[in-house]
């Protein structure tokens, strides 16, 4: 298991992106939309497959009737680091062997990307959103970092 990405949330994508770009001095690349959660993102590639994600609710998305991941429905204030996500293999086994409720494993797709991720029904990760989410990338899918310019 290793850290896959850090998520920086904002009330809108422009704010979150600007925060990262002005803080680090690097331009982010366009990510995409997560239709299932009504969110969208931009990405910044780092070393060794690690990347940063600016994420927010997508105002043009369809209304959903369940909580969004990363507790974005309750996000307010300035952009900030809100979550970290660990890349793992055998995500179902990890969920069974983790002593806290990390949520259910959901299959997610976006463009050419396919992955499984732990998602809690209330959208809040354990320990008030401080515990990591777990992600397992589909072996037949590319990893986002492979298409990102590295900084």
Predicted regions and their residues:
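A short, structural micro-pattern
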Residues: 38, 48, 78, 128-129
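Glycine/small-residue-rich interface belts in oligomeric ring/scaffold proteins
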Residues: 15-71
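Non-catalytic surface loops within mature trypsin-like serine protease
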Residues: 12, 48, 58, 88-90, ...
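Short, functional N-terminal and low-complexity linear motifs
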Residues: 10, 61-65, 140
């Amino acid at each position: 298991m290793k850290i896959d990405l850090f998520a920086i949330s904002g009330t809108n994508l422009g704010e979150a992106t600007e925060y990262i770009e002005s803080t680090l001095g690097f331009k982010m690349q366009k990510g995409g939309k997560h239709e299932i959660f009504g969110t969208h993102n931009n990405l910044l590639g780092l070393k060794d497959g690690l990347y940063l994600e600016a994420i927010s609710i997508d105002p043009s998305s369809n209304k959903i009737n369940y909580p969004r991941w990363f507790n974005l429905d309750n996000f307010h204030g300035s952009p900030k680091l809100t979550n970290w996500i660990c890349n793992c293999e055998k995500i179902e086994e990890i969920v069974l062997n983790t002593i806290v409720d990390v949520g259910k494993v959901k299959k997610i797709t976006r463009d050419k990307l396919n992955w499984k991720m732990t998602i809690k029904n209330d959208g809040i990760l354990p320990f008030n959103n401080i515990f990591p989410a777990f992600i397992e990338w589909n072996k037949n899918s590319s990893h986002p970092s492979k298409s990102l310019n590295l900084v």
